[in-house]
Amino acid sequence: QADPNAFYGLM
């Protein structure tokens, strides 16, 4: 499962 924080970092 990917980390939600990583997704936010991309944004």
UniProtKB/Swiss-Prot annotation:
BP terms from Gene Ontology: defense response; neuropeptide signaling pathway; tachykinin receptor signaling pathway
Keywords: Amidation, Amphibian defense peptide, Neuropeptide, Pyrrolidone carboxylic acid, Secreted
InterPro entries from the UniProt entry: Tachy_Neuro_lke_CS, Tachykinin_dom
Record flagged with keyword Ribonucleoprotein: no
GO cellular component: extracellular region
N-terminal signal peptide: none
Intracellular or extracellular location(s): Secreted
Similarity field: Belongs to the tachykinin family.
Role: Tachykinins are active peptides which excite neurons, evoke behavioral responses, are potent vasodilators and secretagogues, and contract (directly or indirectly) many smooth muscles.
Protein name listed in UniProt: Uperin-1.1
Gene source species: Uperoleia inundata
